[in-house]
Structure formats: C-alpha cells, structure tokens
C-alpha cells in the first residue's frame, strides 16, 4: 500500500515506523486518516487495501496527509469488463447453530411476529397510524412483538418504473416473514389499484393478509379496520417461536456514515460473519451499488458463473448510466462526514464497503424489488442512500440488517437494524444507537474472538432481543424514486 491509517490523532513532526521505514509526519493528521509511506509524483496511483483509491493531484512527500485536497478519483464512465473467476476456499465448518424463529406456512422464518398496516397510497397514512394506535391500546401488544404502520408518500401520481418499484416493495413488505399478519389499507382511487395489487401477492394466506378499501366503506372506516385487525391479531398472537437452523437467516449488509476505520474494523468483521453465515447454508445480501464503483471487479470475479458476472456488469454500468443521464459524475459519492472521517474518494469508500461481504462467491444478483431465491451471497440493485438501501435489503427478504457506521446514525428500517460502530469513541458516546463495537479490533482484540461474540449477538437479536432502533422506536421505510411525479 501507499498509505497507512492513523489509529489516533498525530501531530506534525511525530515519527512512525512502517515496514522498517522511519516516517516523519508533515502535518497534524486526524485519527482514521491516511499518511503517505513514500514520495509520490503527480498522477501516481495511491494504493490502499492493495488497490488504487485514486491518483495524486500533485507531487506528494513521504509523511504527507493524504485527503480529498491532494487525491483525485480515477472513476469516470461505464467500462467493459472481462470475467477472470477467482475461487476461494473458506474452510469454515458448519456448526449446526440454531435460533428461535417463527416458521410460516410457506417455510420462510421470521425473527419477529408483528402486525403491520401497509398503505397502498400515502393518502391513507393518517388512517393507518390511527388504526395502529387503537389496536395498541386495545391489545397492549400481548402475544406479539409489535404493531406498525409503514408510511410512504407514493402509490399514486407515479409512472412506469417508479410505479412498479412502489408496488414491488409494498408487495415484499406484505409477504415478509417478520409479519405475523398484515392489513393492506387502500384509498380506492389511487394508481396502485387495490385489486391489481393484491394479485401481486400470489397465493397468499387470506387469514394473515386482509384488504380494506376505505372509499368503499359506508360509514366509519376505523370501525371496519379494527374489525379486520382483531381477526388478524387473533391469528398472530397464537404464533410461537421454534428452534430452526441458522441456515434460515437472511441478513442484509449495509454501511452508512462511514469513516477511515470502516474498512479496517466493522466492515471486515461483518465480512467474517457473512462468510460464516454462508458456510452454514444461510444468506447475505450486499447492496449500495454506487459504493461498489472502484471495487466492482473484485465482486465480478467472485461470481459463480458467467451469467452472474454479466448480471453484475449490468448492475454496475446501469447505475453509472443513471448517474450520467442526470449529468452527475460517477465518482463524487463521499459525503462531508465520510471525508471528515478519513475517506477521500469513492474508490477509498468502495474498497472498504465491499469488505462487508467477505470472500464468499456471489451466488445471486437481484434487481430492485426482487425477492430472494438463492442462498449464499447475493448482490442487490439499490442506491447508497441509507434509508432506501436498508428498505431494499429488508424487502428482498432479509429478517435483519447489519449496519456499520463510523459517524453514527439512529434510524432503522422495518426489520431489526443492528448498528456496528467502527470505533470505540462512537460506541461510548452513543450507546442508545449502537448495538456492537468493532473498534475493539484496533485495541488488541483478535478478529477470531470478536467474531464469536458478534455471532452470538446476532443470534440473540434473531431470538427476540431488541436492536437499539427497535428499542427506540426508530423504524421507517423509504422507496426508491427516479422518475416523474404527476
């Protein structure tokens, strides 16, 4: 590599030893940021994680602080790629671990047993919330884990792709195994017509999913809604947890508010878990396609076959075309918080981001709104936006989401959203946000030891222990939109 990452703040003039070289720091350098190991001429590629993260904007000296002011991305437009398959043997034994989940009629397993109200259109959000309040007051949630309405602004005034995205995500929520029962709540006149929407659910369990079209109710829609919810509650409260194999777990992999520690602590930790889960017969999903730019060839060459490689090429280039069609550069992703935390370019971010999926082969590629069909590691088309991407992961069928963060974030999607801190300061400062601390990895804890604790924590959450977002009541959905609003 061309750089090293500072594990603590360094002052100008301090001396460090790297691979037998004595390096004097030329500037004050914050923790998580990069220092140059050797002189680099203007235009020279700067390597981190063994790959280029950009090139020097000017001549750089040994010991110089490398950041967005002197490092420029190499990313531009779409590319042509060649399939050069790489196979890694994980050598991880199947431990036959189990968790206690809710087994549904179709064989899927939930980690929660909740009652959900799903509006087909934003016009009925208020009614949905009122119904949830009434059912909570009446039942005290006895015998179930929670009652929620999933507000959104869509379902009408949308065309083509946006309209289908909304319908697919709402369908996926209705069919999610974490829901013991669902009330689909419609206005009646929306573009997302209720009868057509219900057909999208396929052969669904009519005792567990019911429809209320409020414009067709003569009189009080709340009274009619409560009648249906009481029927749904009577079904859901009888569900009990059963011992099932961890192979039934489907886990989403996400990062947000990343910093310079993300790629050396939390993301590799999540990657180790992902490999372990895949070895147990389980499933993990990586998304945030724009945050794969610069690391995409690593994923492409891990595809199990040429067909999956071709799908991954489309996954990447289609998102690049989306950026370019709006006149936006493909490499301007890092946020102000990313840069303040030590991430300078999109390649820098991507090479850290993709470590969340470990080394397992890619066994499936999903479009936005698709539901999981293949066990193992899957890639999913969705943007990097935290709320949109996390919702997409859960919609694909993930029962929980692992979310690494260096800056911190409180939000959660409609499934448990576990926050893993990249550094111990965040873990200490925001215990109400953070579920697990990966910062121990730069404080002497061995990866193999922390992975065992991490596996136990995830299984505890799958068994019913609340993630911090659940405890705080921070749960919401966000649907991808890229077209015209009428």
Annotate each PLM feature.
Residues 1-400, 407-410, 415-486:
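Metallocofactor- and cofactor-centric catalytic cores in central/energy metabolism, strongly enriched
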